[in-house]
Amino acid sequence: MRTLSLLTAGLLLASGVAHAVDEAAAIELAKNNGCLSCHSAKEKIVGPAYSAVHEKYKDDKDAVASLVQSIQYGSKGKWGRIPMPPHPGMSPADIKTLAEWVMTIKP
């Protein structure tokens, strides 16, 4: 039983499910990097609402990695005609924090 518990805990950690996102830090990152000029939690502004992003990618095991790519390098055509600009000045850790946080915002 102990082995099963350890295995389950290890799988949860490896999958990222047990990884808690620091919401306050993520919101501060979003504010400081201009994300909230185009996005909000529940309403479309210029870009999609974070809840819509969550809904679109919720079943994608690579969602966080995809979002990291879009935040770092920008993207075109995923959410309409207006492209998302790249954010090359953000650290990889900050980008990952934002991507993980976005995936916690449910409709």
Task: Describe the role of every protein-language-model region.
Residues 1-24, 107:
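N-terminal export/targeting leaders of redox proteins
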Residues 15-30, 45, 56:
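Electrostatic cytochrome c docking/interface patches
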Residues 33-41, 98:
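The canonical Cys-X-X-Cys-His
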Residues 35, 75-77, 107:
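Generic structural signal for secondary-structure transition and capping sites
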Residues 39, 72, 103-106:
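Protein kinase-like catalytic domain
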Residues 46-57, 72-99:
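Axial heme c-ligation environment in periplasmic c-type cytochrome domains
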Residues 56-66:
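Short microdomains enriched in Cys/His and/or Lys/Arg
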